[in-house]
């Protein structure tokens, strides 16, 4: 422990002298109030400290005490359904302890509840050899999540004691005799530095799709479990709703939602909606699998920078248990702005638009902690982290540094489009500018698992949309009626794909989520209409006759998005109805 004194205060940056024994990334207690800060730069005996609380009223001469430890999070039972701030302070217990709706400065509250007792069930017995990552036992944390207590990193040896029963997170639950003869006494909780990624046995290639229930994503721009995706878009394009939809319905075990520098009412929406929503995979409340990290725009800027790392470290902990985890960061642009502010106050050489020169490497550090891995431990298991980051470029300009650095790393780009949002087409993901580099892997995985021709259907549907885009300029110049019959059909089918398939109402109880079998049935109906109508045109039928003769079945295809999942056979039955009605048109015309 080293004590210095403040010489300069500049917003969230405090410079202290007499800190020659301190290290970079040490946590400090700043001023008489004991504010939490982290050393981010050392020059001789002077330390530059990033303070995670409001610094007003702090002045030169006040003491600074280092703890000698890096910024770390507590990992153990009690994380699920909890809401933390950027440095893992529990907001509900903070409010009860301080009796204030605002963050009182200098208050230290442990992240995990020290009074709560958890029922621990051992899975190993005394005398067994254990290594780091082995599962010692379990705690049923919620109705959905079984919390697996693991041997901490760098601990191995013989299990000499393990107890069943109800324990707090600090009680000694097991003892391990290590190779040097020392006894390690372990509890239900472990700590981990947030800026250091948790070690794994092996990184694997992600192949299994993350099913989100959003048709435009699952069909055209899928992300895998263990993948990384970015959602850039201008104000009002629907970034937050896309993030909320994925958090609600993605087929993962755990969701970490990081509200980083965005509006507080968005976190309020999460708190109001999530407890009432039922997870379609488990039948339980979605909050039973969710961890919330709230660092809204009215909270200290410096803590935004920590919130992303706090979230990804908690995600890695659950991944090491063998769970699939999705982490949503809304928005990484606000996090980058916090980096820019601290860099400016440190008087570092600025890069593009004032962002620090190391912006790209910091963004890469975050997204590279996602992935599919084989975890440590003698019991073989796999875990995944899927990282989905919203980016808020000013004015929707994706050429700005945060978006460009993000796109260099992630493999999925869901580009939200202001003109689509203005036309009330939601989700406003532009199918011509977005891309997914997982498309081939996911397509072959689904073809193999479902024994279907899914990837071929997706290719055909995208070809229709691209053909529509190439015809649009001709239509604007000379009108729709001047096109050939075949091109008029292409325009009509493309409109069906856009309005009846890609458009989705997040606030409709049925349309908000579409399972994969339902997506396939809906797309098959539209493509069958295109195929049969195209054949009819080649046999001599007229476009207008086909459209009039199939008006009823096309209306039913359009309404199929509102048919509940349990009535899937109704949607599948429309395929034969389409063929029958087009044959009827041909017969009526004597063809």
Swiss-Prot record:
<dbReference type="InterPro" id="IPR024034">
    <property type="entry name" value="ATPase_F1/V1_b/a_C"/>
</dbReference>
<feature type="binding site">
    <location>
        <begin position="233"/>
        <end position="240"/>
    </location>
    <ligand>
        <name>ATP</name>
    </ligand>
</feature>
<dbReference type="InterPro" id="IPR004100">
    <property type="entry name" value="ATPase_F1/V1/A1_a/bsu_N"/>
</dbReference>
<dbReference type="Pfam" id="PF16886">
    <property type="entry name" value="ATP-synt_ab_Xtn"/>
</dbReference>
<keyword id="KW-0067">ATP-binding</keyword>
<keyword id="KW-0813">Transport</keyword>
<dbReference type="InterPro" id="IPR020003">
    <property type="entry name" value="ATPase_a/bsu_AS"/>
</dbReference>
<keyword id="KW-1278">Translocase</keyword>
<dbReference type="InterPro" id="IPR031686">
    <property type="entry name" value="ATP-synth_a_Xtn"/>
</dbReference>
<dbReference type="InterPro" id="IPR036121">
    <property type="entry name" value="ATPase_F1/V1/A1_a/bsu_N_sf"/>
</dbReference>
<dbReference type="InterPro" id="IPR027417">
    <property type="entry name" value="P-loop_NTPase"/>
</dbReference>
<dbReference type="Pfam" id="PF22919">
    <property type="entry name" value="ATP-synt_VA_C"/>
</dbReference>
<protein>
    <recommendedName>
        <fullName>V-type ATP synthase alpha chain</fullName>
        <ecNumber>7.1.2.2</ecNumber>
    </recommendedName>
</protein>
<dbReference type="GO" id="GO:0005524">
    <property type="term" value="F:ATP binding"/>
</dbReference>
<dbReference type="GO" id="GO:0042777">
    <property type="term" value="P:proton motive force-driven plasma membrane ATP synthesis"/>
</dbReference>
<dbReference type="Pfam" id="PF00006">
    <property type="entry name" value="ATP-synt_ab"/>
</dbReference>
<keyword id="KW-0547">Nucleotide-binding</keyword>
<keyword id="KW-0406">Ion transport</keyword>
<dbReference type="InterPro" id="IPR023366">
    <property type="entry name" value="ATP_synth_asu-like_sf"/>
</dbReference>
<comment type="function">
    <text>Produces ATP from ADP in the presence of a proton gradient across the membrane. The V-type alpha chain is a catalytic subunit.</text>
</comment>
<dbReference type="InterPro" id="IPR055190">
    <property type="entry name" value="ATP-synt_VA_C"/>
</dbReference>
<dbReference type="GO" id="GO:0046961">
    <property type="term" value="F:proton-transporting ATPase activity, rotational mechanism"/>
</dbReference>
<keyword id="KW-0375">Hydrogen ion transport</keyword>
<dbReference type="GO" id="GO:0046933">
    <property type="term" value="F:proton-transporting ATP synthase activity, rotational mechanism"/>
</dbReference>
<keyword id="KW-0066">ATP synthesis</keyword>
<dbReference type="InterPro" id="IPR000194">
    <property type="entry name" value="ATPase_F1/V1/A1_a/bsu_nucl-bd"/>
</dbReference>
<comment type="similarity">
    <text>Belongs to the ATPase alpha/beta chains family.</text>
</comment>
<dbReference type="Pfam" id="PF02874">
    <property type="entry name" value="ATP-synt_ab_N"/>
</dbReference>
<dbReference type="InterPro" id="IPR022878">
    <property type="entry name" value="V-ATPase_asu"/>
</dbReference>
<dbReference type="GO" id="GO:0045259">
    <property type="term" value="C:proton-transporting ATP synthase complex"/>
</dbReference>
């Amino acid at each position: 422990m080293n004590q210095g004194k403040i010489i300069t205060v500049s917003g969230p940056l405090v410079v202290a002298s007499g800190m020659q024994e301190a290290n970079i990334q040490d946590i400090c207690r700043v001023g008489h109030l004991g504010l939490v800060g982290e050393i981010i730069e050392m020059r001789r005996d002077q330390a530059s400290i990033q303070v995670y609380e409001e610094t007003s009223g702090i002045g030169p001469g006040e003491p600074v005490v280092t703890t000698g430890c890096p910024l770390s999070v507590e990992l153990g039972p009690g994380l699920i359904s909890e809401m933390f701030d950027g440095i893992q302070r529990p907001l509900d217990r903070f409010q009860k302890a301080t009796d204030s709706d605002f963050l009182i400065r200098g208050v230290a509250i442990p992240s995990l509840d020290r009074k709560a007792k958890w029922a621990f069930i051992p899975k190993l017995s005394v005398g067994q050899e254990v290594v780091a990552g082995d599962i010692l036992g379990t705690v049923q944390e919620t109705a959905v999540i079984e919390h697996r207590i693991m041997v901490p990193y760098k601990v191995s040896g013989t299990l000499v004691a393990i107890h069943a029963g109800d324990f707090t997170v600090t009680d000694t639950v097991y003892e391990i005799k290590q190779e040097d003869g020392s006894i390690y006494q372990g509890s239900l909780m472990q700590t981990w530095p947030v800026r250091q990624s948790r070690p794994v046995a092996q990184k694997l290639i992600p192949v299994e799709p993350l099913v989100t229930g959003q048709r435009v994503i699952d069909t055209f721009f899928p992300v895998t479990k263990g993948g990384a995706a970015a959602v850039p878009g201008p104000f009002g394009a629907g970034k937050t709703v896309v993030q909320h939809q994925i958090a609600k319905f993605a087929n993962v075990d755990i969701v970490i939602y990081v509200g980083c520098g965005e509006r507080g009412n968005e976190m309020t929406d999460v708190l109001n909606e999530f407890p009432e929503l039922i997870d379609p995979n488990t039948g339980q409340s979605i909050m039973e699998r969710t961890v919330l990290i709230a660092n809204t725009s009215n909270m200290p800027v410096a803590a935004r920078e920590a919130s992303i790392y706090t979230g990804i470290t908690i995600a890695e902990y659950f991944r090491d248990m063998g769970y699939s985890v999705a982490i949503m960061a809304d928005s990484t642009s606000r996090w980058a702005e916090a980096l820019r502010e601290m860099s400016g106050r440190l008087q570092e050489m600025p890069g593009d638009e004032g962002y620090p020169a190391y912006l790209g490497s910091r963004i890469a550090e975050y997204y590279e902690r996602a992935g599919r891995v084989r975890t440590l431990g003698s019991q073989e298991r796999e875990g995944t982290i899927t990282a989905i980051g919203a980016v808020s470029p000013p004015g929707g300009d994706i050429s700005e540094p945060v978006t460009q650095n993000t796109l260099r790393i992630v493999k999925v780009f869901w580009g939200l489009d202001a003109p689509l949002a203005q036309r009330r087409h939601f989700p406003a993901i532009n199918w011509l500018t977005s891309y997914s580099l997982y498309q081939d892997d996911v397509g072959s995985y689904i073809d193999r698992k479902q024994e279907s021709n899914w990837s071929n259907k997706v290719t055909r549907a995208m070809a229709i949309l691209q053909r529509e885009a190439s015809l649009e300029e001709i239509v604007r110049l000379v009108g729709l009626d001047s096109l050939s019959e075949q091109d008029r059909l292409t325009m009509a089918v493309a409109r069906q794909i856009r309005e009846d398939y890609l458009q989705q109402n997040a606030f409709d109880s049925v349309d908000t989520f579409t399972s994969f079998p339902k997506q396939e049935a809906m797309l098959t109906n539209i493509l069958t209409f295109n195929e049969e109508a195209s054949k009819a045109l080649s046999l001599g039928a007229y476009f207008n006759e086909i459209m009039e003769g199939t008006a009823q079945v096309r209306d039913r295809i359009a309404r199929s998005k509102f048919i509940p999942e349990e009535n899937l056979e109704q949607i599948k039955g429309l395929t034969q109805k389409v063929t029958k009605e087009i044959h009827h048109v041909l017969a009526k015309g004597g063809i």
